[in-house]
Amino acid sequence: MFKKPIIIGVTGGSGGGKTSVSRAILDSFPNARIAMIQHDSYYKDQSHMSFEERVKTNYDHPLAFDTDFMIQQLKELLAGRPVDIPIYDYKKHTRSNTTFRQDPQDVIIVEGILVLEDERLRDLMDIKLFVDTDDDIRIIRRIKRDMMERGRSLESIIDQYTSVVKPMYHQFIEPSKRYADIVIPEGVSNVVAIDVINSKIASILGEV
């Protein structure tokens, strides 16, 4: 008999430790069927634009995401049907030509900077988490990640942070904290918060 999946929303600023918290939850339930879906996968396709136009996109604004498509796919998973999730190419600043097949799972972790900003997404979630990390730590992590994984220059990262990332954090991301069921200071290093979250998930799954 198909059992409706649990959806957990994990948000916070860029470089704040959202993915680490999500992976800590994944690792705590080795026998459960858990998937992590990132909002970043649903950045809009920009193949019709020149590369010069693409790099100017504000990726921290709600309009950069095809959230309608994400909601549609989450509803498919909730109904027990597999979906083909888009894959975003950060170096080309548009979607790649490949997708990832995701089957329904017991738990679906939805992770991204704006997943609590959209009421329609929030309404699909059983647990909503906000990872609250100091600004200095987040920018250092972002610099390391974008230079190593996304081929960005230091100058471009700092320019984007001051002109886009920081203003968007205060306009859209930080205000969404009020919708969180649990706020996690310092992310995955907050062992007490992670234990509380895992206990709640276990109770829903019937593991306790």
Curated annotation (Swiss-Prot):
Superkingdom assignment: Bacteria
A Pfam family this chain is assigned to: PRK
Annotated binding of ATP, by residue: G12, G13, S14, G15, G16, G17, K18, T19
GO MF: ATP binding; cytidine kinase activity; uridine kinase activity
Biological process (GO), any one: CTP salvage
Catalytic activity, reaction form: uridine + ATP = UMP + ADP + H(+); cytidine + ATP = CMP + ADP + H(+)
Single GO cellular component term: cytoplasm
Protein name: Uridine kinase
Organism of provenance: Streptococcus pyogenes serotype M18 (strain MGAS8232)
Gene name as annotated: udk
